[in-house]
UniProtKB/Swiss-Prot annotation:
Keywords: Autophagy, Coiled coil, Membrane, Protein transport, Transport, Vacuole. Involved in cytoplasm to vacuole transport (Cvt), pexophagy, mitophagy and nucleophagy. Recruits mitochondria for their selective degradation via autophagy (mitophagy) during starvation. Works as scaffold proteins that recruit ATG proteins to the pre-autophagosome (PAS), the site of vesicle/autophagosome formation. Required for the Cvt vesicles completion. The lineage of its organism: Eukaryota, Fungi, Dikarya, Ascomycota, Saccharomycotina. Residues 831-863 have a biased composition (Low complexity). Its main location: membrane. Residues 818-830, 909-925 have a biased composition (Polar residues). It holds the Pfam family ATG11. This is Autophagy-related protein 11. Residues 864-877 have a biased composition (Basic and acidic residues). Residues 636-824, 1052-1081 form a coiled coil. Residues 811-882, 895-926 are annotated as: Disordered. Belongs to the ATG11 family. It is a peripheral membrane protein.
Length: 1219
């Protein structure tokens, strides 16, 4: 029977026949070897959440036709307990990742997808000028290899997507199975809780606590016992009150605990429901549609067709001879290759990258699902722990309280049971007294009858002795003795002592006392009846009393003497009848509810005693049997002997029958054992056959795995070399990134400090501006009042002047041109005054009126000097209009010079009056001019601050995007900063320059918040109104008020630091692995201390010492030596003695050992102590411990007879391995 075995965290599924395993432990050992899960951490569940044990496993093996599914859980998945109400910390997520690293199977780590690389066509420029036969064939051959690799990758991506989809479905299904397991576990605890609640309700519904005190005061205090004592005296009321208070306390405590347990159980139920919802939502959200991750059939067909066509075209080109590659063919071939490069290769690469992206996406989905699964397992573990705590409390504390509760209620129930029990007790005492009296009478009668019988027997024996004793002496000598009467005498004596004891014990028991007890019982029943107790109790009293009154001792009947066989049959018949009667009695007792008495005690309506009076016939039958037996005589002796023999035969036959039956049972058992052994033997044979098949399959798999492992090791070594280089690059990038992060942090702090300073300055400027505005309004009011006063005064002076002019005109009508000039001046003054008055009324400004008056005076002077009235009037109007416009646009005031004032002084009195008015208006004009200049300065400062604030905001947004963070709006239009990948691709630079900000063209910002703020800033620059100003400040403040910017930047750098630590850790691991590989490799040149070298014995070639070093180096390596063996001892500068020469001669027989140097021809490496090398060794690998360099200069430094000038090393090495 094949079964599906699913790993709950990896989703891996295997199908295996579980009948191959003899026991559950053997099956667990298989899972341990398969998924490296400890024996104690294995948890096996069935689809309904049942936990697999030995019995269930045997049942599964027995169901040969049913296919079962077993889910394998690692208990470590439940070790990270997670309260669903609490938020997850970063440490918890780190623990999940570490747990996944420890739980995931090592083979899963090899499923690293390789991104498809570009075609060799895209790496070269296809041009017919640079193409030739060899270049084309090489390029096409390389591209064919790339095409084959691409096909393999596509097939692998498809398999990976399909397998990962199945893994995801299995993980989701495992989550549901684990939830079912939790439901089963909680169901038992909830049933236990419900049973406790039900039991408590039963105890509370008895209402004993409410009624006992009333019953005690109204019933027990009114009933008396036989001695006249009240029944209430048998109970301690204070103790009962204490018990009642304890029951109330227990009731409150138990109810309170049950409510608390109910809250926890309901909470666990809600949490379980939430887990169900999360699993369902996770299944809907994560479980991908298989169609989504499958390429369309047309795309697959297109891919296959493109590969096939490209391969066929390439093979056609490669099959051509070199002579066929003429100029025209090269031109067409270049066009064809260029077309393949732009169309075919591009399409193939696009399809492969799309499939690679899909495989990566679904792999990330599986990883996220594993993390979410461990979170849910932690929540399930939390709920299970809470439920277990509830179970312990229910079984320990609550059960003890309920037992106490029940015991206390039983004590209180005794209050209601005492009247009933005491009445029955009195009736039972009455019955016992009746029994004693009857026994006493019977005993006295028996003694009298025994005495008469003995005397009669003595008389009979004496008569027989008298008649036959003389002859009977031949048979016996004691026929006349009465030894058999000794036993009867002892019985008689015992009866006499027994009679005395009975008389002493029951001397107080008499008919009078017996009748007195009967009267008390009847009185007691009447009292109970008067107290209106339950009628069933009174009926029970009367029934029992009637039984006690009619009680007579039964005598055994000896009417019938039956055999053993008949006795057994009779007993069986009685037993069957008794069972039927018990069944009827049981049904009658529990079906007749009305006959049940009140209180906790349940009494039966069946009579406890029965008046079985022996009939006269039975007595007569007993007497007749006795007399018949006496009359049998000696004729019956033979019959008794034969019966005894027959009985012995029957006993022997029964024993033999039992023995035969026992032997038959043994034979049957042996036959059963033999058949079981045969079945087990066949099962073992079948199991052994399957195990052999499985072993052969595993052996083949192991061989393939070892082969694949060797290939993977080679690929892994190649990848490690690439990873070492990439790690170095990453470390350099990390160091640069750290420097950049420090610079960004310092610049950020400076900018924040500047921003705070500018905020304070701006706030001070706003306060001063408001104060200036208030002062300006006050000055404006004063100015208007002063202006009004001066205007009125000026009107009065003007009228007076007009009167004087009119008088002067009347007196000097005939004067010269000078008087006419004065008259024309007066007219121009009038017109100017009227115009200035109108302008001052409309604009309410003193500057326009005063300027008009001054210009009118200047024009009148010029006109008088030119003697042209009409020309001066036109010029005066034009200049007044121009000057007024200039005054309004430039917001400036021109004052008359000293020369002009002097010329006016020399003019008429009207000029002096104008001078005095102008002098009075000058202080007001200067003060207003100062206020306007300050307001303009404040406005310029405000504009500068707003521009500076906008620049700071822009810089901060740019910094955020430079480190991969994007400032956007959330669904509530609040600022949020998100991590966005690929955000830095279009940025011109990654760090802001210290001299200034980037221009808008140089700073592409993708933030929609920045776009909105930029729009507000542009509106403010155009309008300079307060509404735009407030909107701009409120938007910018949202970034800094809640420290959103600072938090995001700090967190980003913390993530970068964490990533740097992770990369450093991975680099360290890879470095250690690299060091391990480096230490294991054998060095072939440039030996150093610590290197591994291959040492070989040298060969003896005949080369003279005077040969040149170059020829010697080119002829052989360190192992191709022509020198004799070394002289044993290290090289020294001392002269050799005769003893050393003898030793050297002895060592000539041994061949020297040298290190193998395949790529070095300038030096030789000889082993210092070859004596330590075991004999008959062809080679050994040694670790170099010491090197000493020598150059051959003379005979002393040339023990190996090397050419002069040759370099050699003396090496000390330890043996690592040898052969």
């Amino acid at each position: 029977m094949s079964s599906n075995i699913i790993n709950a965290i990896t989703g891996e599924l295997i199908t295996i026949d579980i009948t191959l395993f003899i026991s559950l432990n053997e099956f667990k050992k298989f899972l341990i070897n398969r998924w490296q899960i400890d024996f104690n951490n294995l948890l096996l569940l069935l689809p309904f959440g049942n936990k697999i044990n030995d019995r269930i496993f045997i049942d599964l093996i027995g169901k040969k036709n049913d296919q079962s599914t077993i889910y394998v859980f690692d208990r470590r998945l439940f070790s990270l307990v997670n309260n669903p109400d609490n938020e997850l910390s970063s440490d918890y997520l780190t623990n999940i990742k570490n747990l996944l690293k420890g739980i995931n199977h090592p083979t899963n780590n090899l499923n690293q997808l390789v991104k498809p690389v570009n075609s060799p066509y895209e790496e070269v420029e296809i041009n017919e000028k640079f193409l030739n036969y060899h270049t084309i064939t090489s390029l096409i051959t390389t591209n064919l290899g790339w095409l084959s690799a691409l096909e393999i990758d596509m097939h692998y991506f498809q398999i990976q997507i399909s397998d990962t989809l199945d893994y995801i479905k299995n993980i989701i299904e495992s989550l549901k199975i684990c939830q079912n397991y939790l439901e089963l576990y909680c169901y038992d605890v909830e049933n236990l809780y419900n049973s406790n609640v039900k039991f408590l309700n039963q105890l509370a519904n008895n209402e004993i606590l409410k009624n006992w005190l009333n019953y005690y005061d109204n019933i027990l205090t009114k009933l008396s016992d036989i001695n006249g004592n009240k029944l209430s005296s048998y109970l301690n009321k204070n103790e009962l009150v204490s018990i009642s208070s304890k029951i109330e306390e227990l009731d409150q405590r138990v109810n309170s605990n049950l409510k608390k347990f109910k809250i926890v159980i309901d909470k666990n139920i809600d949490l379980r429901n939430n887990i169900n919802k999360e699993i369902s939502s996770l299944s809907e959200k994560i479980t991908p549609s298989s169609e989504k991750y499958k390429l369309e059939e047309t795309m697959l067909e297109k891919f296959t067709e493109l590969v096939k066509n490209l391969r066929n075209d390439s093979k056609v080109i490669l099959e051509k001879d070199e002579n066929e590659f003429d100029k025209n063919y090269m031109q067409n071939l270049a066009k064809s290759l260029e077309k393949d490069k732009k169309v075919t290769v591009t399409n193939l690469l696009t399809i492969s990258k799309a499939l690679y992206s899909q495989a990566n996406d679904i792999s990330e989905i599986k990883s996220k699902l594993q993390v979410d699964s461990i979170k849910l397992f932690g929540q399930i573990s939390f709920i299970q722990i809470e439920t277990l705590n509830i179970k312990k409390l229910l079984l320990n504390e609550l059960n003890k309280d309920l037992e106490k509760y029940q015991g206390f209620e039983l004590k209180l129930a005794h209050v209601q049971d005492i009247p009933l029990v005491y009445g029955l007790y009195s009736i039972e005492n009455y019955r016992r007294e009746s029994w004693v009296l009857q026994i006493n009478y019977k005993h006295l009668d028996f003694n009298k009858s025994l005495k008469t019988i003995v005397e009669k027997e003595k008389s009979t024996r004496n008569k027989w002795v008298d008649n036959f004793g003389s002859t009977a002496v031949y048979f016996t000598e004691d026929m006349d003795t009465l030894r058999d009467f000794n036993y009867l005498n002892n019985i008689a004596k015992g009866n006499q002592s027994m009679i005395k004891k009975l008389e002493e014990l029951f001397k107080n028991i008499s008919n009078e006392s017996h009748n007195k007890n009967l009267v008390f019982i009847e009185t007691y029943i009447k009292e109970v009846e008067d107290l209106d107790l339950d009628k069933d109790v009174i009926e029970l009293f009367k029934r029992y009393l009637a039984v006690a009154q009619g009680f007579v001792i039964e005598q055994p009947s000896t009417k019938n003497i039956i055999s053993d066989k008949e006795t057994g049959e009779l007993i069986n018949g009685y037993q069957s009848r008794i069972k039927k009667l018990e069944l009827l009695l049981h049904s009658a007792r529990y079906s007749n509810v009305e006959s049940w008495p009140t209180g906790l005690l349940n009494y039966s309506n069946v009579k406890l005693f029965r008046n079985n009076v022996a009939t006269v016939n039975s007595k007569l039958s007993l007497q007749s049997d006795y007399m018949g037996n006496i009359s049998y005589g000696s004729d019956q002796l033979r019959i008794k002997e034969l019966e005894n023999v027959n009985k012995q035969y029957k006993t022997d036959f029964k024993a033999l029958t039992d023995e035969n039956k026992l032997l038959k049972d043994k034979v049957t058992k042996f036959n059963t054992d033999i058949s079981d052994i045969q079945i087990e033997r066949n099962a073992y044979k079948e199991t052994l056959t399957k195990l052999n098949e499985e072993l052969s399959r595993l052996t083949s798999i192991e061989g393939d795995f070892e082969k694949h492992k060797g290939e993977k090791e080679i690929e892994l070594k190649i990848k490690i070399d690439g990873l070492v280089d990439s790690n170095k690059t990453l470390l350099n990038q990390i160091s640069d990134l750290k420097i950049e992060s420090k610079e960004l942090e310092s610049s950020n702090r400076d900018l924040l400090a500047q921003l705070n300073q500018k905020r304070e300055e701006h706030k001070v400027l706003e306060d001063s501006l408001k104060q200036r505005e208030n002062e300006g309004l006050r000055y404006k009011d004063e100015y208007e009042a002063k202006l009004k006063e001066l205007t009125e005064k000026f009107e009065a002076d003007r009228r007076a002047l007009e009167d004087e002019i009119k008088a002067a005109k009347e007196q000097n009508m005939k004067e010269s041109m000078e008087q006419q000039t004065e008259q024309s001046a007066n007219q121009s003054i009038d017109q100017s005054i009227e115009q200035s008055t109108e302008q001052s009324t409309e604009q309410s400004t003193e500057q326009s009126m005063e300027q008009s008056m001054e210009q009118s005076m200047e024009q009148s002077v010029e006109q008088s000097m030119e003697h042209s009235m009409e020309h001066s009037m036109e010029q005066s109007e034009k200049q007044n209009m121009g000057q007024n416009d200039a005054t309004i646009d430039n917001q400036s005031i021109e004052t008359p010079t000293s020369e002009d004032m002097h010329s006016l002084d020399e003019q008429s009195p009207e000029s002096q009056l104008l001078k005095s008015n102008t002098t009075e208006l000058q202080p007001i004009k200067s003060q207003e001019l100062a206020e306007d200049s300050k307001a303009i300065e404040l406005k310029n400062i405000q504009e500068m601050l707003v521009s500076k604030l906008y620049e700071i905001f822009s810089s901060n947004v740019f910094i955020l995007e430079n480190i991969g963070l994007l400032l956007t709006f959330d669904e509530h239009d609040n600022f949020q900063i998100r991590r966005v990948k690929g955000l830095k691709k279009n940025l011109n630079q990654s760090v802001l320059e210290e001299t200034g900000l980037l221009n808008e063209i140089e700073m592409p910002v993708k933030s929609d918040v920045f776009s909105e703020v930029k729009t507000l800033f542009s509106n403010y620059k155009e309008t300079f109104d307060s509404r735009s100003y407030i909107s701009l400040l409120s938007k910018i403040n949202q970034l800094y008020d809640c420290k959103l910017y600072e938090t995001a930047v700090i967190k980003r750098f913390e993530d970068i630091e964490l990533l740097a630590k992770k990369l450093a850790k991975e680099n360290k691991a890879k470095k250690n692995l690299f060091e391990k590989y480096r230490c294991e490799r054998i060095t072939l040149k440039n030996f150093e201390v610590g290197d591994l070298a291959l040492f070989l014995p040298t060969r003896e070639n005949c080369i003279t010492e005077d040969v040149s070093v170059a020829s010697w180096n080119s002829s052989f390596s360190s192992v191709d030596l022509s020198t004799p063996p070394p002289f044993g001892e290290p090289i020294t500068n001392q002269s050799h003695s005769g003893t050393a020469k003898d030793k050297n001669k002895h060592n000539l027989e041994k061949r020297p050992w040298a290190a193998f140097t395949a790529f070095e021809e300038t030096a030789r490496y000889f082993l210092k102590d070859p004596e330590n090398i075991p004999n008959n060794r062809e080679w050994f690998v040694g670790k170099i411990m010491h090197l000493q360099r020598f150059v051959v200069e003379d005979h002393i430094s040339n023990p190996y007879k090397l050419p002069k000038g040759a370099v050699w090393f003396q090496v000390t090495a330890t043996v690592v391995s040898h052969q």
